[in-house]
A protein has these predicted regions:
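Alpha-helix N-cap/helix-start motif at helix boundaries, enriched for small hydrophobics
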Residues: 117-118, 126-134, 215, 228
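Basic, Lys/Arg- and aromatic-enriched nucleic-acid-binding interface segment
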Residues: 99-128
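Active-site/catalytic core of tyrosine-dependent DNA strand-transfer enzymes
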Residues: 160-203
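Conserved tyrosine-mediated DNA breakage-rejoining catalytic core shared by Y-recombinases
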Residues: 134-165
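N-terminal core-binding DNA-recognition domain of tyrosine recombinases/integrases
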Residues: 3-91
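Short, basic (Lys/Arg/His-rich) helix/loop patches that form interaction surfaces
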Residues: 194-230, 234
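DNA breakage-rejoining catalytic core of tyrosine-based enzymes
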Residues: 78, 88-104, 152-161
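Short functional hotspots where side chains directly engage DNA or cofactors
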Residues: 144-148, 217, 226-244
Length: 244
């Protein structure tokens, strides 16, 4: 079976030396795990091992192995055409880690509360619970900042001119989101957010997904992980390490 790697690479025209070495390494590692007799079971074992690698490496290895499996099938070395798939968790991470165009969030909506919730999350990285606890006196219009008080800790976040314009009309209230002077429940917030995201065609997103979009935008702007952690109210950067 191992000699099949050399034969496979010989048929790969136009590959650079580095690319051939990469193919060879991935395929030898593949055979080390599945053994000389390829089966559905051995492939599942290999596929489970893929989750230990970064997503980019997983995609490369799956592509190389699928090409090799097809080559073996064509040559009659294996009687079944097997095909590996990217681990589900990797697919999920891939989707969640994609920087999305959310410019439509600034457009009018039939769900204005859900819209503002979404903007506060994606622009400032706030949690729904933090947003619902916000009082209008936490907003300083003159200095364009927002004060977050949580668990005896305070953090100050800068407000963009656009976001400030969204908050100004609410300054006569006690809370940013309230009914008869009392804050809305978390369930209400999630319903409003869900309805807004569905309206804008992002029904697969959630508050957590929007918070990740904030992180991705910060990284795109070359903001240091420690500074991002500070903005999010995190004590360490541990949960942000995957974005390095």
């Amino acid at each position: 079976m191992r000699e099949g790697i050399s034969a496979f690479l010989e048929e790969k025209q136009g590959l650079s030396v580095n690319s051939k070495q990469s193919y060879k390494y991935d395929l030898e590692q593949f055979l080390d795990l599945v053994g000389e007799r390829i089966s559905e079971t051995s492939l599942k074992i290999y596929q489970a091992q893929l989750s230990n690698f970064k997503i980019s490496a997983q995609k490369r290895k799956v592509s190389a192995c699928n090409q090799f499996l097809y080559f073996l099938y064509q040559k009659g070395e294996i009687g079944t055409f097997y095909r590996l798939e990217l681990p589900k968790q990797a697919e999920k991470k891939q989707v969640q880690s994609e920087l999305l165009d959310l410019s439509s969030f600034w457009q009018e909506s039939a769900y204005p509360e859900g819209r503002l919730l979404a903007l506060l999350i994606v622009e400032l990285g706030l949690l729904p619970s933090e947003i619902l606890a916000l009082k209008t006196n936490d907003v300083n219009l003159d200095f364009q900042v927002l004060r977050i008080n949580k668990a005896s800790q305070q953090r100050i976040l800068s407000l963009s001119t656009n976001l400030l314009g969204e908050l100004e009309p609410l300054m006569g209230q006690t809370y940013l989101f309230e009914k008869a002077g009392k804050p809305y429940s978390r369930q209400w917030a999630f319903r409003q957010l869900e309805a807004f995201l569905k309206e804008k065609g992002f029904s697969d997103l959630s508050a957590q997904g929007l918070r990740e979009q904030f992180i991705l935008r910060q990284i795109e702007e070359k903001v240091d992980l420690y500074e991002i952690a500070k903005k999010l109210g995190l004590k360490t950067v541990m949960t942000l390490e995957k974005y390095r």
